[in-house]
């Protein structure tokens, strides 16, 4: 598994309750561009339209040897999930307060581009502070155990 892009702020801004792996529909030049690590999912989000999931606001740079004239690097890209996963995701969204965020974009062992998504709930400012305090405390504990 080769990670191409990761959403590093996802764990800071959201509480992730469930993770789902989805395939992503790409053109050939987009796949070649991702193989040389020119993609980003920072600030991207997933929406549901007409019973399908779409990745919006992701950026995949145009492949330099591509001959596409009107290439849009931040176009919507369709996500491929099973019916059961889609029902689970749409149920969480309709429940309220939950959203779907992309966590990482990678190539599977078979060479397919995959997107790891998380069903998440947004954190408030005090929740973010609590998670920072908890992380710092865990670091201090490790240092104390290491020194003793």
Q: Each predicted region: which residue ranges?
A:
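N-terminal nucleotide/polyanion-binding subdomain common to many enzyme families
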Residues: 1-2, 131
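Ribosome large-subunit tunnel/peptidyl-transferase-proximal elements
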Residues: 2-98
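Short, charged/polar low-complexity linear motifs in solvent-exposed/disordered segments
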Residues: 51, 72-74, 106, 119, ...
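Flexible glycine-rich active-site/ligand-binding loops centered on an Asp-His dyad
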Residues: 60, 128-145
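Short small-residue beta-strand/loop micro-motif enriched in glycine and branched aliphatics
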Residues: 67-69, 124-127
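Beta-rich strand-turn-strand
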Residues: 82-118, 122-124
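Surface-exposed, charge/polar-rich loops and edge strands
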Residues: 148
């Amino acid at each position: 598994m080769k990670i191409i892009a990761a959403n590093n702020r996802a764990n800071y801004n959201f509480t992730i309750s469930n993770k789902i792996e989805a395939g992503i529909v790409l053109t050939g030049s987009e796949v070649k561009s991702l193989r040389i690590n020119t993609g980003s999912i920072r600030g991207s989000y997933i929406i549901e339209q007409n019973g399908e999931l779409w990745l919006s606001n992701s950026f995949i740079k145009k492949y330099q040897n591509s001959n596409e004239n009107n290439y849009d690097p931040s176009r919507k890209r369709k996500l491929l999930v099973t019916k059961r996963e889609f029902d689970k995701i749409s149920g969480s969204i309709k429940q309220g307060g939950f959203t779907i965020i992309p966590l990482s974009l990678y190539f599977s062992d078979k060479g397919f581009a995959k997107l790891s998504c998380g069903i998440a709930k947004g954190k408030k400012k005090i929740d973010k502070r609590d998670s920072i305090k908890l992380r710092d405390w865990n670091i201090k504990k490790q240092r104390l155990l290491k020194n003793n």
